């Protein structure tokens, strides 16, 4: 029998300081890409965009990003299916995944294995804070001042 402790995903050590971490972002809308790029570049992150979940799955294995952000409604492999596949694959299961959508889908995102869910429209401070918190959970949260 497998204990709950044995099922926990291993935490990948951060090789890149969080401010220069590579973020793989799955978004097809060019206007939203521009907004996300501005928010994340402004915070000091390196961002790589892809159009669909299948591309993201392939690049996640090749690039080993620090975090993956995905919209639910993307072509091919949707964001929830992408999340499930990432979390089921040993070499990618430790990568934090943030799912975002205009849909009220937080429960479905969590069930798919998402580490966080953000409702669109995205707010810069919330997006950046969630990314920072997932990259280094021991840092004090800017929102609360607490770890």
What residue ranges belong to the model's regions?
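Non-catalytic signal-transmission and effector/linker regions of two-component phosphorelay proteins
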Residues: 1-24, 28, 125-147
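The feature encodes the CheY-like receiver
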Residues: 33, 74-75
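Charged docking surfaces used in two-component/phosphorelay signaling
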Residues: 34-42
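Alpha4 helix (beta4-alpha4-beta5 surface) of REC/receiver domains from two-component response regulators
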Residues: 37, 81, 102-119, 125-129, ...
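Short hydrophobic/Thr-rich beta-strand motif most characteristic of the beta2 strand and flanking loop
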Residues: 44-51, 59
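Acidic catalytic/metal-coordinating carboxylates
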Residues: 52-55, 78-81
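Active-site residues of response regulator receiver
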Residues: 71
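A short, hydrophobic beta-strand element within the central beta-sheet of small alpha/beta folds
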Residues: 93-104
């Amino acid at each position: 029998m497998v204990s709950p402790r044995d099922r926990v995903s291993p935490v990948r050590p951060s090789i890149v300081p969080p401010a220069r971490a590579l973020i793989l972002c799955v978004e097809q809308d060019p206007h939203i890409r521009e907004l996300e790029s501005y928010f994340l570049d402004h915070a000091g992150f390196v961002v790589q965009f892809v159009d669909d979940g299948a591309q993201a799955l392939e690049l996640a294995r090749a690039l080993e990003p620090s975090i993956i952000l995905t919209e639910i409604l993307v072509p091919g492999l949707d964001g929830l299916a992408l999340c499930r596949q990432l979390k089921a694959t040993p070499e990618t299961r430790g990568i934090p995944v943030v799912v975002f959508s205009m849909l009220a889908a937080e429960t479905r995102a969590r069930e798919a294995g998402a580490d966080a869910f953000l409702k669109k429209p995205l707010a810069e401070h919330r997006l950046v804070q969630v990314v920072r918190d997932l990259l280094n959970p021991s840092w004090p949260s800017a929102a609360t001042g607490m770890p």
